[in-house]
Design a protein with these regions (language model features):
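Cys-dependent protein tyrosine phosphatase-like superfamily
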Residues: 1-89, 100-141
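Short cysteine clusters
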Residues: 92
Length: 141
């Protein structure tokens, strides 16, 4: 269920409370929620996942991404979340927004766009929807 982007990040579709324990068993120490509350009435709410994470001894951060797109502060928040070096699991409805946010964060930090595309592709995700933004960030624009 968890798709590995690199040694420090996996992404996933919406997780359940039980998935928090599975993530911990895989060595995850940080859960990043990229899904806004209320997007799917049947999905666990942010506070529920946060409580399960804290009960399991995991760190938790919410950086909700709506379908309206990504912002600079969201990219910066993802950079900050990953900067601590924790093994992280990021999730949203399908894992796509989590992957694209990671991709933008990596580009802003100077990772080559083709390497970003390769890593995302290895996990089954396509960065084409934000490739122009990735190229601009990687170029320092």
């Amino acid at each position: 269920m968890f798709r590995k982007i690199n040694d420090n990040l996996s992404v996933s579709p919406q997780i359940s409370l039980d998935d928090v324990a599975a993530a911990k068993a895989e060595g995850v120490s940080l859960i990043i929620n990229n899904r806004p509350d209320g997007e799917d009435p049947g999905a666990p709410q942010s506070a529920d996942i946060e409580a399960a994470a804290r009960d399991a001894g995991l760190k938790y951060i919410a950086i909700p991404i709506t379908h309206s797109g990504f912002s600079g502060p969201q990219v910066d928040a993802m950079i900050a979340a990953l900067a601590e070096g924790d093994k992280a699991l990021a999730y949203c409805r399908s894992g796509t927004r989590s992957t694209l946010l990671w991709a933008l964060a990596q580009a802003k930090q100077g990772m080559e766009p083709d390497e970003i595309a390769r890593l995302a592709g290895n996990a089954g995700y396509d960065i084409t929807p934000v490739r122009a933004m990735i190229d601009a960030l990687a170029a320092g624009s």
